[in-house]
From Swiss-Prot:
Residues 7-21 have a biased composition (Basic residues). SUPFAM superfamilies: Ribosomal protein S20 (SSF46992). Gene3D superfamilies: Ribosomal protein S20. GO terms for molecular function: small ribosomal subunit rRNA binding; structural constituent of ribosome. GO terms for cellular component: cytosol; small ribosomal subunit. The lineage of its organism: Bacteria, Pseudomonadati, Pseudomonadota, Gammaproteobacteria, Moraxellales. InterPro entries: Ribosomal_bS20, Ribosomal_bS20_sf. Keywords: Ribonucleoprotein, Ribosomal protein, RNA-binding, rRNA-binding. This is Small ribosomal subunit protein bS20. Binds directly to 16S ribosomal RNA. Coiled coil: none annotated. The gene is rpsT. GO terms for biological process: translation. Pfam families: Ribosomal_S20p.
Length: 89
Protein backbone atom coordinates (compact mmCIF):
# COMPACT_ATOMS: atom_id res chain seq x y z
CA UNK A 1 0.00 0.00 0.00
CA UNK A 2 1.17 3.49 -0.78
CA UNK A 3 2.45 5.43 2.23
CA UNK A 4 3.50 8.85 0.97
CA UNK A 5 1.02 11.42 -0.26
CA UNK A 6 2.65 11.33 -3.68
CA UNK A 7 2.31 7.54 -3.93
CA UNK A 8 -1.32 7.69 -2.82
CA UNK A 9 -2.10 10.29 -5.46
CA UNK A 10 -0.35 8.27 -8.17
CA UNK A 11 -2.38 5.22 -7.12
CA UNK A 12 -5.61 7.22 -7.50
CA UNK A 13 -4.51 8.56 -10.88
CA UNK A 14 -3.56 5.08 -12.06
CA UNK A 15 -7.03 3.75 -11.26
CA UNK A 16 -8.60 6.55 -13.31
CA UNK A 17 -6.16 6.06 -16.20
CA UNK A 18 -6.68 2.29 -16.19
CA UNK A 19 -10.45 2.74 -16.56
CA UNK A 20 -10.00 5.23 -19.40
CA UNK A 21 -7.47 3.05 -21.20
CA UNK A 22 -9.75 0.02 -20.87
CA UNK A 23 -12.51 2.02 -22.53
CA UNK A 24 -10.22 3.00 -25.40
CA UNK A 25 -9.01 -0.59 -25.87
CA UNK A 26 -12.62 -1.73 -25.98
CA UNK A 27 -13.37 0.86 -28.66
CA UNK A 28 -10.48 -0.41 -30.80
CA UNK A 29 -11.71 -3.99 -30.45
CA UNK A 30 -15.22 -2.90 -31.47
CA UNK A 31 -13.97 -1.25 -34.67
CA UNK A 32 -11.91 -4.34 -35.49
CA UNK A 33 -14.89 -6.64 -34.83
CA UNK A 34 -17.12 -4.56 -37.10
CA UNK A 35 -14.61 -4.95 -39.91
CA UNK A 36 -14.16 -8.68 -39.29
CA UNK A 37 -17.94 -9.22 -39.19
CA UNK A 38 -18.38 -7.34 -42.47
CA UNK A 39 -15.66 -9.48 -44.05
CA UNK A 40 -17.29 -12.65 -42.72
CA UNK A 41 -20.62 -11.53 -44.18
CA UNK A 42 -18.91 -11.18 -47.56
CA UNK A 43 -20.05 -7.60 -48.14
CA UNK A 44 -17.14 -5.78 -49.78
CA UNK A 45 -18.56 -2.24 -49.58
CA UNK A 46 -19.47 -2.52 -45.89
CA UNK A 47 -16.11 -4.15 -45.13
CA UNK A 48 -14.25 -1.37 -46.94
CA UNK A 49 -16.14 1.35 -45.07
CA UNK A 50 -15.60 -0.40 -41.74
CA UNK A 51 -11.89 -0.75 -42.50
CA UNK A 52 -11.59 2.94 -43.44
CA UNK A 53 -13.22 3.89 -40.12
CA UNK A 54 -11.08 1.46 -38.11
CA UNK A 55 -7.65 2.52 -39.43
CA UNK A 56 -7.53 6.04 -37.94
CA UNK A 57 -8.82 4.73 -34.61
CA UNK A 58 -6.16 2.01 -34.52
CA UNK A 59 -3.46 4.55 -35.42
CA UNK A 60 -4.64 7.01 -32.79
CA UNK A 61 -4.58 4.37 -30.05
CA UNK A 62 -1.08 3.31 -31.11
CA UNK A 63 0.07 6.94 -30.90
CA UNK A 64 -1.39 7.21 -27.40
CA UNK A 65 0.29 3.98 -26.32
CA UNK A 66 -2.98 2.15 -25.69
CA UNK A 67 -1.82 -0.60 -28.04
CA UNK A 68 1.69 -1.24 -29.31
CA UNK A 69 2.56 0.24 -32.70
CA UNK A 70 3.51 -3.17 -34.06
CA UNK A 71 0.19 -4.62 -32.95
CA UNK A 72 -1.59 -1.75 -34.68
CA UNK A 73 0.38 -2.38 -37.87
CA UNK A 74 -0.38 -6.10 -37.67
CA UNK A 75 -4.13 -5.49 -37.28
CA UNK A 76 -4.22 -3.03 -40.17
CA UNK A 77 -2.20 -5.31 -42.43
CA UNK A 78 -4.29 -8.40 -41.76
CA UNK A 79 -7.60 -6.58 -42.09
CA UNK A 80 -6.47 -4.94 -45.33
CA UNK A 81 -5.39 -8.31 -46.74
CA UNK A 82 -8.78 -9.80 -45.89
CA UNK A 83 -10.64 -6.89 -47.48
CA UNK A 84 -8.52 -7.18 -50.63
CA UNK A 85 -9.14 -10.93 -50.77
CA UNK A 86 -12.86 -10.22 -50.50
CA UNK A 87 -12.61 -7.83 -53.47
CA UNK A 88 -10.99 -10.46 -55.67
CA UNK A 89 -13.77 -12.99 -54.99
Amino acid sequence: MANSAQAKKRARQNVKARKHNASLRSMVRTYIKRTVNAIAAGDYTVATEAYKKAVPVIDRMADKGIIHKNKAARHKSRLNAQVKALASN
